[in-house]
A protein has these predicted regions:
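Short, amphipathic alpha-helical "lid/cap" segments that border enzyme active or binding sites
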Residues: 18, 118-126
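RNA pseudouridine synthases
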Residues: 24-27, 37-44, 49
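Divalent-cation
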Residues: 34
Length: 130
């Protein structure tokens, strides 16, 4: 059976990512966004937070970023782009963890940011751990 060089390379990248995340978590308290960190660090008992938003909240946030980058997508294009990004995140998470991305049982806290300012949410969450 032949090995797949792309799959082999992806697996090596994932392994290195695991090593880096573990090393960071062992050195000090840290916040890691994504990268299957909840799963990779599960033996270290991390506080796992899943931040999500409804589609209209995601679109609004993207529109705000879009203005500063001078990009423009139609609502339909933007919605499809967001769905594609979420689909790839779910596939990545599922592939490496055998768990469902966004499933509340995998997290200690789930935060809906649809009607919230992300910076305010981050500040509030930071205060939880001071």
């Amino acid at each position: 059976m032949m090995s797949n060089p792309i799959a082999d390379h992806s697996q090596k990248i994932y392994q290195e990512q695991c090593n880096i995340l573990r090393e960071m978590a062992e050195k000090s308290n840290c916040v890691i966004v994504g990268r299957c960190a909840d799963y990779i660090l599960k033996d270290m008992n991390p506080f796992r937070i899943f931040v999500y938003a409804e589609m209209e909240g995601k679109m609004e946030r993207c529109r705000q970023k879009e203005q500063s980058h001078h990009n423009t997508m139609t609502d339909r294009e933007l919605k499809q782009h967001i769905k594609d990004v979420d689909k790839h995140r779910a596939q990545y998470y599922g592939f490496y963890t055998d768990q469902k991305w966004g499933d509340r049982k995998n997290y200690d806290l789930c935060v809906n940011t649809t009607n919230a300012d992300i910076k305010n949410v981050a500040a509030i969450l930071t205060k939880l751990f001071e």
